[in-house]
């Protein structure tokens, strides 16, 4: 049965046509039983019903190609929050080990403004970079830490600059705006040591959303802006679901996809806040005056549409914003240190930060 997709904005701004209209076929499906031809129709409400055969692009690395062919178990009962957090902790340990081989560092646990932080100092830190700092807001669906190692270690290594990873309070125990408040508190404290034009704030997934939210909050509070923002795979709003969320899971085409119901996204994080609140959903904010921003996403990212939509909103607000899209790869693929594309993505992120900090 074809997958129901929400309509048509996906055709407007994205160059990767093969990825845009695709049925999610479970990984257990063999080539002999998978769909072999393209079919589609659009009903009177603009809902698309599609089946697509999507070959992997020829320039994908062998490592990335292998990573796409992963067995996904049948959909079982939802995992408990405790189990999810334990799994994320194990994943973080693997990220730490893999990336630390490529980017030697020292890691220290601390607190800043009463907020737990993890400070990653690259072995390549030079005297000229001691007056600069990068502030990371990790991914993890706002309820776990899925990436503070995979986001901070390579960026510290490739920039040669210390990273402060903020271990902000998590939902559902602490819904919005707790994470924003924690990040702003750490930023305020960093301003006592570092000039704002020597700070970059960045994050992936939930941390990318949080980066955009913090930028709006800093403007609202009249605090000085950092030198730059890095928004790597983000939602643009919480009151609606974008097209790519109706196509992909967090593993791209792999796994079971529940059709979006059109309601509030992530109610445990949103809590009692109006989902159109401009800090919570930055697409509704006045974005004028924000610093240069790099957006990064990928062709099979569930948050591809949200990232592209927010990038366009930044451009409409005359922000110096640029967007990089990696073909065919799933959500936050750059956590995987074994992929050449992950190293490339991390270098792109790091080079952008270095250019902005050099101004």
Q: What do the predicted segments below correspond to?
A:
Residues 3, 62, 81-82:
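Short alpha-helical segments used as structural interaction elements across diverse proteins
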Residues 24-43, 51-77, 102-359:
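Alpha/beta-hydrolase superfamily serine-hydrolase fold, recognizing
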Residues 81-110:
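A domain-start/cap signature at the N-terminus of enzymes
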Residues 1-11:
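Bacterial N-terminal signal peptides that target proteins for export
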Residues 8-10, 69, 88:
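General helical structural elements
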Residues 9-19:
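Bacterial N-terminal signal peptides
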């Amino acid at each position: 049965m074809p997958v129901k997709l929400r309509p048509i904005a996906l055709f407007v701004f994205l160059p990767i046509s093969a990825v845009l209209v695709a049925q999610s076929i479970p990984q257990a499906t063999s080539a002999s039983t998978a769909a072999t031809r393209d079919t589609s129709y659009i009903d009177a409400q603009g809902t698309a019903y599609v089946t697509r055969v999507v070959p992997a692009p020829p320039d994908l690395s062998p490592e990335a190609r292998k990573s796409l062919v992963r067995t996904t178990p049948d959909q079982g009962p939802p995992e408990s929050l405790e189990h999810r957090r334990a799994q994320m902790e194990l994943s973080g340990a693997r990220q730490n080990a893999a990336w630390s081989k490529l980017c030697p560092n020292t890691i220290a646990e601390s607190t800043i403004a009463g907020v737990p932080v993890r400070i990653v100092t690259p072995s390549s830190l030079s005297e000229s970079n001691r007056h600069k700092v990068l502030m990371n807001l990790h991914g993890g669906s706002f309820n776990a830490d899925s990436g503070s190692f995979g986001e901070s270690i390579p960026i510290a290594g490739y920039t040669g600059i210390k990273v402060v990873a903020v271990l902000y309070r998590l939902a559902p125990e602490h819904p919005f705006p707790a994470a924003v408040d924690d990040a702003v508190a750490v930023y305020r404290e960093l301003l006592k040591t570092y000039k704002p034009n020597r700070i970059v704030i960045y994050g992936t997934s939930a941390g990318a959303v949080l980066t955009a939210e913090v930028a709006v909050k800093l403007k609202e509070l009249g605090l000085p802006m950092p030198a730059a923002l890095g928004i790597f795979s983000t939602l643009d709003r919480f009151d609606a679901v974008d097209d790519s969320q109706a196509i992909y899971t967090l593993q791209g085409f792999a796994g079971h996809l529940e059709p979006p119901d059109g309601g509030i996204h992530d109610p445990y994080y949103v809590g009692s806040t109006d989902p159109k609140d401009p800090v919570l959903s930055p697409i509704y904010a006045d974005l004028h005056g924000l610093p240069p921003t790099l957006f990064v996403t990928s062709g099979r990212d569930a948050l591809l549409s949200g990232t592209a939509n927010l990038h366009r909103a930044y451009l409409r607000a005359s922000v110096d914003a640029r967007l990089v899209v990696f073909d065919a790869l799933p959500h936050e693929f750059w956590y995987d240190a074994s992929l050449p594309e992950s190293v490339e993505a991390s270098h792109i992120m790091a080079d952008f930060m270095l250019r902005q900090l050099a101004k």
